[in-house]
Amino acid sequence: REVQDLLGFIKLDLLVVKDLEVIRLALESIKSNYGIEINIENIPLDDRQVFQMIQDGHTTGLFQFDGSAVPKRILIDSGADRIADLSATNALDRPGALNMGADKEFVERKLHPEKTTYMTPYAEPYLRETYGTVCYQEQLSQLSQDKHIIGFDAGQADTLRKVTAHKDKKKIEKMVALAKETARSNNVPENIYNWFCDLAVEFGKYAFNHSHSLAYAVIAYRGGFLKAHFPEAFLSALCQIKPMMKGKDKTT
């Protein structure tokens, strides 16, 4: 990976997402059997029936939410009712985040917003969406660029994002040292920049990309929309594309 980076090569992960095929097949079935043509890209993203189904734990067949029991627990316990909650759940379902108790913090703060706190008011714009819990690489990068927290320029912030994403301990330590130096030059209080640096070290254990997580959430939601409103078409498509799902969860 380091050699590829030095040579300027772009790394592309090309993965097969069978859930997209499930959605396509379900849409074809709905059109054929009910005469209803759905533009899946234009469905409402706040459908109450979809989120009620998710809150009830009926996530079988929903992308990223039908395997481990962890995301289902987070969705149920938090009463997920926004795409942003689905996205955060994806990011929190990582060993490092779970070991740090970030999932429990997220659930508690979503249920009781008054318990949401910020180390500094300047952190709120970047963490408000996730109730003060850091979930994404982008949040760490944004925090680092605020002159009241660290004051990195865009290039330094992106380097920090990369080293945490790659979980490179030595490079993370180097960036933390630079962060402290930069913060001091910006007259940032010691407790603020130490908080951020501790966060960067811990975050390097589980950093997750927001755009990645959000894309996952949208796929899950679209599947959930079809499952909630056209269960026969969705489950039929699911069994055809993912035959191993048959009988997996009788509660669906």
What is each of the regions a protein language model found here?
Residues 1-252:
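Noncatalytic, beta-rich nucleic-acid-contacting surfaces in large DNA/RNA-processing enzymes
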